[in-house]
Amino acid sequence: LQGVVSSLPDPLNKSAMTSLPFRFEIDVPAGAGGLSGDTLKLAAGSVFQAQFQRRHEGGKTIIARGGLALNEPLRMADKGVLLAASADRLDADAWRKALAGNPERRDKASGAAAGSDGFPLSGLALRAGELRMLGQRLNDVTLRAVMEEGGWQARLTSKEATGEIVWRDQ
C-alpha cells in the first residue's frame, strides 16, 4: 500500500511514503459458487489480520464467525467475532470514532446497510502499555471481555484500576 494514506488510529495510521503489504482473499467452497457462503481474509503486513466466515441468506450476508488481530495471532470465535489486540499505545476513543464513520454518510447508505445485521463482536482480548478509553488514560492494561445475553462481562487490570465490569444493553 505504498502511495496510500491511512487516517485510521495507530497502529494502522500511515503516510503515503510508508509501505505496508496488503492481502485480500475470498475463498468460495468448491461447487457452491459462493451462493451459501464464503471466507473473507485480510492482512496488512504483520500488524493486522482478519478472517470472517460468512453466510448468504435471504439477500443478507451474515458473519457467522471470525477474528480480528492487531499485533496478535489471529484467533476465530466459535460464534461472532473475536478481537485480539496488543499495542504500546491504544486510543480506544479514536478507534470508536473511526469505526462509527460519518453519521450523515451512514444515514444516506442505510438502504445498502439494511441487508446487514451489523458486526457481531462477541469477545475482546486487549493488552496495552497505555490505553485511552472513555476520556481516561490507563497504564499496563489487560482487558478481557465476552458478550453475554443482555450485555458485556469484562475483567480489567491496570495500574490505575482493577475489577469486573458488567455493561448492560439498554
Task: Go through each PLM region and give its residues.
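Membrane-proximal interfacial segments on either side of biological membranes
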Residues: 1-40, 51-170
